[in-house]
C-alpha cells in the first residue's frame, strides 16, 4: 500500500508538471486528468472517499470546461508537442525547482511525518470528511457566497472581453 500511495504522489507531481509545461492546451488536458485522478486516488487511500469523489467531479469538470474553452480559442494548425526542446527545458527547470525546494525545506530528513486517516476518532460518530463538508456550508457560507459572486463577475468580464467591438453574448436591447 505504501508503494501504491508513493506511486500516486509521483503521478500527481508529474501531472502537475505536465499541466505547467504544456506547449498547447490540447496536451494540458492529459496532465490535468492524470493529476486529478492521482490526487483523488491519494485522498481515497487516506479514507476520504466522499471528499475525493466531490473534488474529482467538481475540479475535473470545471477545469475541463476551461480547457475546452481555451482549445476552442487556440487555433494552432501545428501545435507544439511535449517532445520539443523548449518544452523539455521547461520540464527540467520545473524538476530542478522542485528538488531544490524539497532539499531546502528539509523534507528529505523527515520521512516519518505520520499519516492519519479521516475515520471517526473517539466519541465522534461522523467521519471527519463528512463533517468538514457540513462545516463548509454552515460556517463558510459567507466566503461561499463571495466566491460565487466573484465567479459570476468573472463570467461577465470574460463575456465582455470576448465580445470585442461587435455584438456578442451580452446585447443592449
UniProtKB/Swiss-Prot annotation:
* UniProt keyword annotation of Mitochondrion present: yes
InterPro entries from the xrefs? Answer: ComplexI_Subunit6, NADH_UbQ/plastoQ_OxRdtase_su6, Nuo/plastoQ_OxRdtase_6_NuoJ
The GO cellular component terms are: mitochondrial membrane
Gene3D superfamilies per record: NADH-ubiquinone/plastoquinone oxidoreductase chain 6, subunit NuoJ (1.20.120.1200)
Q: Name one GO molecular function term.
A: NADH dehydrogenase (ubiquinone) activity
The identity of this protein, by name, is NADH-ubiquinone oxidoreductase chain 6
> Catalysed reaction per UniProt?
a ubiquinone + NADH + 5 H(+)(in) = a ubiquinol + NAD(+) + 4 H(+)(out)
Gene encoding this polypeptide? MT-ND6
Give the way it sits in the membrane. Multi-pass membrane protein
Q: What are the TM regions of this chain, as residue ranges?
A: 1-21, 27-47, 48-68, 87-107, 139-159
Q: Which family does it belong to?
A: Belongs to the complex I subunit 6 family.
Q: Where in the cell is it found?
A: Mitochondrion membrane
Functional description taken from the UniProt entry: Core subunit of the mitochondrial membrane respiratory chain NADH dehydrogenase (Complex I) that is believed to belong to the minimal assembly required for catalysis. Complex I functions in the transfer of electrons from NADH to the respiratory chain. The immediate electron acceptor for the enzyme is believed to be ubiquinone.
Enzyme class, broadest EC rank: translocase
Output the superkingdom of the source species. Eukaryota
**Enzyme Commission designation:** 7.1.1.2
Q: Which UniProt keywords apply?
A: Electron transport, Membrane, Mitochondrion, NAD, Respiratory chain, Translocase, Transmembrane, Transmembrane helix, Transport, Ubiquinone
* Main location as per UniProt: mitochondrion
